[in-house]
Structure formats: C-alpha cells, structure tokens
Amino acid sequence: MSASVEIFSDSKTMVGAAGKRLASTIQSAVAARERALIVLTGGSSGIGLLRDLATRGQQIDWSRVHLFWGDERYVPKDDDERNEKQARVALLDHIDIPPSQVHPMPAGDGEFGNDLEAAALAYEQLLAAYAAPGYPTPNFDVHLMGMGPEGHINSLFPNTVAVRETSRMVVGVRNSPKPPPERITLTLNAIQRSREVWLMVSGTAKADAVAAAMGGAPSASIPAAGAVGLETTLWLLDEEAAAKIPG
C-alpha cells in the first residue's frame, strides 16, 4: 500500500491542517464504531497539534475518545520531559474527557519503580484489554508520530533491539541515544495494527530521512520506514522536510 503525502508551506500550516483532519477523523470513527482510539505523540509538531485540537474541542464527543501514547520518557510523573505532562498542558486540561479514558504510560516514580520491563509489560496488558478477543492490541484509529533526523519514531531508534522486536507490542528502552536514557515505547508490531498512521515532519534536517523512509529503506536502519497503517499511511510534511522526496 502506497503512502499519501501532503506538503505544506511551513510547520505551522501543517500542524493546523493535521488538527482539523484529526478532529474530523475522530468524528468519523465515533460514527462508525462508537469510539475513537488515538495514539498521541510528543515533540514540537505533536504537542502543537494538541494545542490546535484544544481549540476544536467542542467539535468532538470526548466521552467516546480513548487516548494512548506511542512512547514515554521513564521519568517522574511531574517531570517536564513527560509527553503526558506536555499533553495535559496543551490539550487534556482544556477538554472534558473522562479520566478513565486517558491512558498514560507508567512513570519512573510510579508503582513499578526501577523495573522498566514490568512497566512496559503493564502497558502492553492495558492495550490488550482494549483489543478484540485474541488480539494483542486494538486497531488504533490514528497513531500520531513525529520523526527524528535519523529516522527514529516513538522511541524506536535505528539499529536497536527495540526496533527489531518481532513479538512484543510494548518494550522498555535503556540507553536511548537521545536523553533521557530510559523510555517505554510501542513497537512496530503495535504501530502496524493502527488503521491510520500519520507522520508529521518538518525541517531541512529531516529531509534525508524522509526520502529514505519513503524510498523503502529497511526499518531497522530507518524506523519510520516501518510506520505503516492498515488502511492509511499519511506523511504530513513542510516544504523543507519534503525537499528530497524523489520526483
């Protein structure tokens, strides 16, 4: 299945278009299946999208929405590095969503303490609770993600054990190339069970990785190449990030 590409003049325009599209996609998912399962991401574009979505909050029946995370820094709950904390400031504190439908990953000062693997397993078990019988994860309606200049997505970095994982849906990451070193991440297995995967990428520094991912590079070396949805794979790019896409 080929990916779809939308190119925007700048990152601000890209984020606004993504927010509008996400609000509409949530509405469609609720109409079709009575709920929407969305995987959030951090980073400048991911948090910018959440700020935009907060302005569209009245368009969405939040009582039918479940929010998950693609990855998280395994740091204390109130640490500013937490994707969850940034999401609360940008979106969650401004909408009327039932707390039981917000599913953050465990924090480093939580019940699992230093046991990163137990924390990852607990999140994997949580995902299974929302899946159809016999399946390890639900079919997320949208998995949002950014991409690093070397092609990493979530906390799946090039040529690491996590990006090569073939059975687990969620794993712990130690010695991350990007600080902080300890993280929890959904694997490519989980990502690929999403109906739609959206990659939001901006900036010249990421143009080479965008071109490599879209050109069929191995996912072990360019993890974004493995970010493929069951129905839709959508690249939302600014002109700088799109500059090296072939033809």
Swiss-Prot record:
List GO BP terms, alphabetically: carbohydrate metabolic process; pentose-phosphate shunt
Identify the InterPro entries for this entry. 6-phosphogluconolactonase_DevB, Glc/Gal-6P_isomerase, NagB/RpiA_transferase-like, PGLS
SUPFAM superfamilies in the record: NagB/RpiA/CoA transferase-like
Query: PANTHER family from the xrefs?
Result: 6-PHOSPHOGLUCONOLACTONASE (PTHR11054:SF0)
Function of the molecule:
Hydrolysis of 6-phosphogluconolactone to 6-phosphogluconate.
EC nos: 3.1.1.31
Among the Pfam families in the record, one is Glucosamine_iso
Please give the Gene Ontology molecular function terms for this protein: 6-phosphogluconolactonase activity
- Record's family? Belongs to the glucosamine/galactosamine-6-phosphate isomerase family. 6-phosphogluconolactonase subfamily.
Q: Which UniProt keywords apply?
A: Hydrolase
Q: In which pathway does it act?
A: Carbohydrate degradation; pentose phosphate pathway; D-ribulose 5-phosphate from D-glucose 6-phosphate (oxidative stage): step 2/3
Signal peptide coordinates? none
By what name is this protein known? 6-phosphogluconolactonase
Reactions that this protein is recorded to catalyse: 6-phospho-D-glucono-1,5-lactone + H2O = 6-phospho-D-gluconate + H(+)
